[in-house]
């Protein structure tokens, strides 16, 4: 990734990193754009499953998500390389200002050389995308060995009856409208109910336990919760079909 820096000589006590830090701020803004792009790809992918729409491999949402994950990794590496270089120069205080651009590029390439597919397992949005896509396909009866055959083998009656108990919030005992999943244990709850429960516990300086009977997760935090888009769509699909049958 290209970068620019001044190579003027002089004592580090006169070096101003304000320009570099401003550029870093801009890069972090771009990170939010990548995050939004991943959200869009995830939403489109779930739409395709829900509407039973086939697309060519050229427009695969999986491929698009991988590209976004690669961009996110590359940008994170570059930001890390710049921050590491700045910290190093501040600590070492060399008599002459080194070639900052060269130092950043060396650190960046060193990080890039360690790239592997396993990195994607650390990308929360990528992992969430794969999990939600898998869950929605499961709700629609699409198995992994049938993914390339579009919606072949889909059984709509199975969609209606499958895992309806998963639609019930363990706190309210009502069907969920805005389900969120606990990243730590995998259980789901109605967002408003679980947020209220966690806040209530924390205000009393107590730990919030997962309300699902038998769950061993005893220290829930707000950061553990993520929207369960796949389950929300499955619930809506079930309710639409139930409404059609009653008309």
Swiss-Prot record:
Q: Give the residues the record marks as binding Zn(2+).
A: 185, 187, 210, 215
Is Zinc-finger one of the keywords?
A: yes
The GO biological-process annotations, alphabetized, read as:
cell division; cellular senescence; double-strand break repair via homologous recombination; positive regulation of maintenance of mitotic sister chromatid cohesion; positive regulation of mitotic metaphase/anaphase transition; protein sumoylation; protein ubiquitination; telomere maintenance via recombination
> Pathway involvement?
Protein modification; protein sumoylation
Keyword list, A-Z: Acetylation, Cell cycle, Cell division, Chromosome, DNA damage, DNA recombination, DNA repair, Isopeptide bond, Metal-binding, Mitosis, Nucleus, Phosphoprotein, Telomere, Transferase, Ubl conjugation, Ubl conjugation pathway, Zinc, Zinc-finger
CDD domains the UniProt entry points to: SPL-RING_NSE2
Residue spans, zinc finger SP-RING-type:
154-240
What GO cellular component entries does it have? Answer: chromosome, telomeric region; nucleus; PML body; Smc5-Smc6 complex
Which sequence ranges are marked TM in the entry?
A: none
Q: E.C. number, please?
A: 2.3.2.-
Q: Which GO terms describe its molecular function?
A: SUMO ligase activity; SUMO transferase activity; ubiquitin-protein transferase activity; zinc ion binding
Q: Where is this cross-link: Glycyl lysine isopeptide (Lys-Gly) (interchain with G-Cter in SUMO2)?
A: 90, 107, 125, 130
Query: Which InterPro entries does the protein's record reference?
Result: Nse2(Mms21), Ubox_domain, Znf_MIZ, Znf_RING/FYVE/PHD
Q: Which residues carry this modification: N-acetylmethionine?
A: 1
- Enzyme kind, highest EC tier: transferase
Q: How is it modified after translation?
A: Sumoylated, possibly via autosumoylation.
Question: Which residues are recorded with the post-translational modification Phosphoserine?
Answer: 116
Q: Does the keyword Lipid metabolism apply?
A: no
The record's subcellular locations are:
Nucleus; Chromosome, Telomere; Nucleus, PML body
Q: What does this protein do?
A: E3 SUMO-protein ligase component of the SMC5-SMC6 complex, a complex involved in DNA double-strand break repair by homologous recombination. Is not be required for the stability of the complex. The complex may promote sister chromatid homologous recombination by recruiting the SMC1-SMC3 cohesin complex to double-strand breaks. Acts as an E3 ligase mediating SUMO attachment to various proteins such as SMC6L1 and TSNAX, the shelterin complex subunits TERF1, TERF2, TINF2 and TERF2IP, RAD51AP1, and maybe the cohesin components RAD21 and STAG2.
Q: Subunit composition?
A: Component of the SMC5-SMC6 complex which consists at least of SMC5, SMC6, NSMCE2, NSMCE1, NSMCE4A or EID3 and NSMCE3.
Q: Which family does it belong to?
A: Belongs to the NSE2 family.
Question: What name does this protein carry?
Answer: E3 SUMO-protein ligase NSE2
Origin organism is Rattus norvegicus
Organism lineage reads as: Eukaryota, Metazoa, Chordata, Craniata, Vertebrata
Name of encoding gene: Nsmce2
């Amino acid at each position: 990734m290209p970068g620019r820096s001044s190579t003027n000589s002089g004592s580090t006590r006169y070096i101003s990193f304000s320009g570099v830090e401003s550029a870093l701020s801009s890069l972090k803004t771009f990170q939010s754009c990548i995050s939004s792009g991943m959200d869009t790809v995830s939403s489109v992918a779930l739409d395709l499953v829900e509407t039973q729409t086939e697309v060519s491999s050229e427009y695969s949402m999986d491929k698009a998500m991988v590209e976004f994950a690669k961009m996110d990794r590359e940008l994170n590496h570059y930001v890390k390389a710049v921050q590491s270089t700045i910290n190093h120069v501040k600590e070492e205080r060399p008599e002459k200002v080194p070639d900052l651009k060269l130092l950043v590029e060396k650190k960046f390439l060193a990080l890039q050389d360690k790239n592997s597919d396993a990195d994607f397992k650390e990308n929360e949005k990528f992992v969430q995308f794969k999990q939600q896509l898998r869950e929605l396909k499961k709700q629609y009866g699409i198995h992994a060995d049938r993914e390339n055959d579009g919606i072949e083998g889909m059984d709509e009656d199975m969609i209606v009856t499958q895992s309806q108990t998963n639609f019930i919030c363990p706190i309210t005992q009502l069907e969920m409208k805005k389900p969120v999943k606990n990243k730590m244990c995998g259980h789901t709850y109605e967002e408003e109910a679980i947020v209220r429960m966690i806040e209530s516990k924390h205000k009393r300086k107590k730990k919030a336990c997962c309300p699902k009977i038998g769950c061993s997760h005893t220290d829930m935090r707000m950061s553990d919760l993520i929207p369960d888009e796949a389950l929300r769509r499955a619930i809506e699909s079930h309710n639409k079909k139930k409404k059609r049958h009653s008309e």
